[in-house]
């Protein structure tokens, strides 16, 4: 067995790994064609079939090290075995998928070829047969084609082609089942004998623990001869291709100049000079094709980006056109399969529970938009699924009274007819066989029942308290997505409409996926090729060579020196704005990764990043503790900061989502919130040359000059800008139990202080009662409660209400000075009196991994691309 001591200079010179930290490796000799073999140990013997105890090395058995050429494939299968929860779960899953696919083929073939639908419609059975004097019908004779292929029409040819195509696909999956079974058994051996983890333990063991065991195994069995393995290296290998797709979306490269009404079109992220809006698009079908054309084709067998791929955009454009043309030819067969699949999966559910069609789920675009760098699949699903309830609650903040009124009337009328039919059924069941207008009463009962269920689902709940800001903050706790254009406008229809493009009705999303089968070929042939140059330039600019890993997206490598943003706590600031990630996604991804893998030790810049956040957190905690220690100041600020009452504990374990433990900075403080957006909004107050200081000086002078000026306006402006963004960017449900709930500065909109999940609705915690408006008195909710003299939504008027569409980079990198100068200018441009208002669900084909082909082996020269 090769020990770790064998890793010497000769080995390093043989592999010639290069680390491109300061610049893209694609511009510094990226494509070296040396063979990069990774050494991996053999597996020990499998334990006895009935035993769950992992076996060790018996009878002097030794584990020899043998090199493997594809460490990416090893990490991928290691994770797949963990995600699918062991050997028997994998076997059962594959068997069920094969049976399901076979059933779809047989089911659709029988009903599309053998069933005579015209004969079935004209067949007379039951009372109809008796009344017509015919013999009782025989469905086999009446509705079954004895010769299904006669006559052989164009429709029949399409159906036969569909059956033949998917039959071949089923046979391919069947053979692949046995081919993968051997690899699955090998990885079971590896888990049992090398990691000492059984299938039962996998069910409850965190993924980070599995990686820790692999890292520990490296020291004794030399899994990688180039360098010591780390959790970061293995996850970068696992998500090598996915990180590029996440980066492309983050930089807006998958936005196309299409109309908003095209199925699958997401939010607009930028506008052209001529007014054309670019909408993000990533349907499931488009994702598959981009995966085939770009992600699976860009790497060679050494996990390096192929030089000819990035230097020849014409080849990629041709490939996109050919794939689009092939999809256009296959689209009739794909549509048939999708229709049959969706019918079998959802028809019974929609029939018995029609309201299911009006439920919502995140679109495929939103999932990739929310996903972070190096975030593995099961952790992301847990996070995104936790946001569904809160996203639904947010959309309920925008009631539709007219629709509810009409739906109540329709439900009342249809429910009345359904009730009459129920009474008839109780009196005499045979009466239901009677006919009215050619239909029996059973048919009417089904129709009225369905109409009643759908209309009742359209009736919106009557919310006693509308709090779009607070509800949006709960959404962002899990999605970590809060565009700057949303802040301060949570109660606007524009934000609601944009969220609805990401959080769609289930029925509408299924229809869009079917329509995307025809739209994707058009995009591939005529739209996507126009962005090929930008996509390849992104790959050039954001690819680095990591020793022992290969080429990866530089965002996933957490290079603060090249891509850092000091507004999000980075110790370095990228010289060019284009090098930074949008909305601080790299910084958020780093914090998430550090919390998910606590045993991983980052570099010095990463530690400095965490230190910056700790310092910021401690300073804010000290400020709030000082504020609360003064009774007079606490009382004065409580009138201006209703959100401070949110620090009351509210059953922190009730939600059942404990993912916030992943967002720890200090392991001893398990109630730590997510600080990055709070840090971002607070940087405006910490700059010595920031215009807000000039505004504060003016405010102070005016405060001393007049008694009518609100004495806490300066404090209100600073704290109000912090609250909403800190609250809306916390990483998860534990924000409700966080110790930093005491440190909630007033948000951009200080309204919405009542917690959405708080059953208590005390009047003293509802709004800001510091200023009394005699010009706009509010209605009193109850005679025992003080009147609300302030419009809680007037806060939004202090912001720019124009809905501007900008590019992602421009939106997130806009300087905070503009906001503060504008606020100060507006406050100083008017005479302020005491009576003035002064506030502010996826469709996956079976064996979807069949598209994950191994990197293409190419022989490229060691030359630079530029």
From Swiss-Prot:
Keywords from the UniProt entry: Autophagy, Lipid transport, Membrane, Transmembrane, Transmembrane helix, Transport
Example of a GO cellular component annotation carried by this entry: phagophore assembly site membrane
Residue spans, topological domain Cytoplasmic: 1-94, 175-319, 341-404, 455-507, 529-866
Residue spans of biased composition, Polar residues class: 768-781
InterPro entries attached to this UniProt entry: Autophagy-rel_prot_9
Gene Ontology biological-process annotations: autophagy; defense response to fungus; lipid transport
Membrane topology label: Multi-pass membrane protein
Lumenal side: 116-153, 426-433
Effect of a null allele: Mutant plants are hypersensitive to nitrogen or carbon starvation and show early bolting senescence.
Tissue expression: Expressed in roots, leaves, stems and flowers.
Localization per record: Preautophagosomal structure membrane
Region (Disordered): 744-781
The record's note on its domains: Forms a homotrimer with a solvated central pore, which is connected laterally to the cytosol through the cavity within each protomer. Acts as a lipid scramblase that uses its central pore to function: the central pore opens laterally to accommodate lipid headgroups, thereby enabling lipid flipping and redistribution of lipids added to the outer leaflet of ATG9-containing vesicles, thereby enabling growth into autophagosomes.
Reported function: Phospholipid scramblase involved in autophagy by mediating autophagosomal membrane expansion. Cycles between the preautophagosomal structure/phagophore assembly site (PAS) and the cytoplasmic vesicle pool and supplies membrane for the growing autophagosome. Lipid scramblase activity plays a key role in preautophagosomal structure/phagophore assembly by distributing the phospholipids that arrive through ATG2 from the cytoplasmic to the luminal leaflet of the bilayer, thereby driving autophagosomal membrane expansion. In addition to autophagy, also plays a role in necrotic cell death.
Family to which the UniProt record says this protein belongs: Belongs to the ATG9 family.
Quaternary structure, from the entry: Homotrimer; forms a homotrimer with a central pore that forms a path between the two membrane leaflets.
The protein's name in its UniProt record: Autophagy-related protein 9
The species this protein was found in: Arabidopsis thaliana
């Amino acid at each position: 067995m090769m020990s770790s001591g064998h890793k010497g200079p000769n080995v390093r010179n043989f592999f010639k790994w290069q680390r491109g930290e300061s610049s893209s490796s694609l511009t510094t000799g990226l494509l070296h064609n040396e063979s990069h073999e990774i050494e991996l140990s053999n597996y020990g013997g499998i334990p006895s079939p009935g035993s769950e105890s992992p076996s060790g090395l018996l009878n002097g058995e030794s584990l020899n090290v043998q090199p493997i050429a594809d460490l990416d494939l090893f990490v991928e299968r290691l994770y797949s075995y963990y995600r699918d929860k062991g050997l028997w779960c994998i076997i059962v899953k594959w068997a069920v998928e094969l049976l399901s696919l076979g059933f779809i083929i047989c089911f659709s073939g029988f009903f599309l070829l053998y069933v005579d639908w015209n004969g079935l419609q004209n067949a007379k059975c039951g009372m109809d047969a008796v009344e017509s004097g015919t013999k009782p019908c025989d469905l086999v004779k009446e509705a079954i084609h004895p010769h299904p292929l006669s006559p052989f029409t164009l429709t029949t040819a399409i159906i036969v082609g569909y059956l033949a195509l998917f039959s071949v696909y089923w046979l391919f999956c069947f053979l692949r089942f046995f081919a993968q079974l051997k690899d699955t058994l090998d990885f079971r051996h590896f888990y049992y004998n090398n990691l000492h983890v059984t299938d039962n333990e996998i069910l409850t063991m965190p993924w980070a623990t599995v990686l820790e065991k692999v890292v520990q195994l490296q020291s004794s069995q030399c899994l990688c001869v180039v360098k010591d393995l780390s959790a970061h290296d293995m996850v970068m290998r696992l998500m090598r291709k996915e990180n590029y797709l996440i980066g492309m979306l983050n930089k807006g490269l998958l936005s196309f100049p299409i109309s908003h009404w095209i199925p699958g079109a997401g939010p607009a992220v930028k506008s052209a000079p001529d007014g054309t809006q670019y909408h993000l698009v990533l349907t499931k079908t488009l994702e598959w094709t981009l995966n085939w054309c770009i992600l699976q084709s860009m790497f060679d067998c050494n996990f390096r980006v192929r030089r000819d791929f990035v230097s020849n955009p014409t080849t990629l454009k041709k490939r996109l056109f050919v794939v689009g043309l092939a999809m256009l030819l296959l689209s009739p067969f794909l549509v048939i399969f999708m229709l049959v699949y969706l019918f079998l999966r959802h028809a019974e559910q929609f029939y018995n529970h029609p309201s299911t069609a009006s439920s919502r789920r995140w679109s495929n675009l939103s999932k990739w938009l929310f996903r972070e760098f190096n975030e593995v699949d099961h952790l992301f699903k847990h996070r995104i699924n936790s946001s569904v309830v809160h996203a639904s609650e947010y959309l309920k903040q925008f009631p539709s009274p007219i629709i509810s009124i009409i739906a109540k009337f329709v439900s009342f009328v249809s429910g009345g007819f359904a009730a009459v039919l129920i009474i008839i059924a109780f009196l005499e069941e045979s009466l239901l066989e009677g006919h009215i207008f050619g239909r029996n009463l059973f048919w009417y009962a089904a129709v009225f029942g369905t109409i009643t269920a759908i209309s009742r689902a359209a009736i919106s709940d009557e919310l006693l308290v509308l709090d779009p800001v607070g509800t949006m903050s709960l959404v962002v706790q899990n999605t970590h997505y809060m565009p700057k254009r949303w802040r301060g406008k949570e109660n606007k229809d524009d934000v609601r409409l944009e969220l609805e493009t990401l959080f769609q009705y289930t029925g509408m999303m299924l229809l869009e996926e079917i329509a995307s089968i025809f739209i994707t070929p058009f995009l591939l042939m005529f739209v996507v090729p126009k962005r090929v140059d930008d996509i390849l330039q992104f790959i050039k600019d954001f690819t680095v060579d990591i020793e022992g890993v290969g080429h990866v997206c530089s965002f996933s490598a957490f290079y603060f020196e090249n891509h850092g943003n000091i507004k999000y706590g980075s110790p370095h600031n990228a010289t060019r704005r284009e090098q930074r990630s949008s909305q601080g996604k790299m910084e958020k991804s780093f914090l998430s990764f550090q919390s998910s893998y606590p045993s991983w030790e980052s570099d010095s810049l990463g530690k400095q990043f965490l230190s910056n956040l700790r310092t910021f957190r401690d300073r804010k905690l000290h400020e709030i503790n000082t504020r609360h220690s003064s009774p007079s100041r606490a009382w004065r600020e409580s009138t201006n900061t209703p959100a401070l009452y949110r620090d009351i504990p509210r059953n922190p374990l009730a939600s059942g989502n404990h993912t916030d433990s992943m967002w720890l900075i200090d392991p001893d403080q398990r109630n730590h919130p997510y600080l990055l957006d709070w840090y971002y909004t607070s940087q405006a107050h910490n700059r010595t040359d920031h215009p807000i200081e000039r505004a504060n000086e003016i405010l102070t002078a005016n405060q001393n000059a007049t008694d009518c000026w609100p004495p806490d306006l300066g404090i209100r402006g600073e704290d109000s800008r912090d609250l909403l963004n800190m609250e809306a960017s916390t990483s998860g449900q534990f924000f409700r139990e966080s110790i930093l709930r005491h440190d909630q500065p007033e948000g951009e909109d200080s309204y919405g202080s009542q917690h959405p999940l708080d059953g208590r609705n005390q009047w003293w915690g509802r709004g800001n009662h510091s200023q009394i408006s005699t010009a706009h008195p509010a209605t009193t909710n109850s005679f025992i409660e003080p009147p609300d003299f302030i419009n809680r939504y007037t806060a939004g008027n202090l912001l720019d209400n124009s809905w501007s569409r900008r590019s992602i980079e421009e939106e997130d990198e806009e300087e905070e000075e503009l906001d503060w100068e504008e606020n100060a200018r507006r406050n100083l441009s008017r005479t302020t009196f005491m009576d003035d208002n002064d506030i502010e669900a996826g469709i996956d084909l079976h064996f979807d991994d069949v598209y994950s082909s191994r990197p293409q082996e190419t022989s490229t020269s060691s030359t630079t691309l530029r």
